[in-house]
Swiss-Prot record:
It comes from Haemophilus influenzae (strain ATCC 51907 / DSM 11121 / KW20 / Rd). Residues 1-85 form the YcgL domain. The lineage of its organism: Bacteria, Pseudomonadati, Pseudomonadota, Gammaproteobacteria, Pasteurellales. Gene3D superfamilies: YcgL domain. PROSITE patterns: YCGL (PS51648). This is YcgL domain-containing protein HI_1446. InterPro entries: YcgL-like_sf (IPR038068), YcgL_dom (IPR027354). HAMAP family: UPF0745. Pfam families: YcgL (PF05166).
Length: 88
């Protein structure tokens, strides 16, 4: 499965993974406001041989299937995205 990976210009080290390029319909609007305008980094095959940095491909794949997106945040986060369940 190919996915599109976007980085945040507002939040260093934060990445948003979606199933289809430019399709943010599953991403809550509040999250997108905090994330800022997503900047495409690459298209990535989650079922391929290459690994992702700091995140498990299977976890990303299952989360995208379940909720339509995956949010990767920096290890040193200030808590902005920690309440993702409240944003939904």
């Amino acid at each position: 499965m190919l996915c599109a990976i976007y980085k945040s210009k507002k939040k260093l080290g934060s990445y948003l993974y979606v199933a289809n390029r430019e399709d943010f319909s599953s991403v809550p609007s509040v999250l997108l406001e905090h994330f800022g305008k997503p900047e495409l980094v690459m298209m990535f095959n989650l079922l391929g041989r290459k690994a992702l940095h700091n995140v498990d491909c299977n976890e990303v794949l299952e989360t995208i299937k379940r909720q339509g997106f995956y949010l990767q945040i920096a290890k040193q986060d200030d808590g902005l995205f920690n309440s993702l369940s409240e944003i939904k």
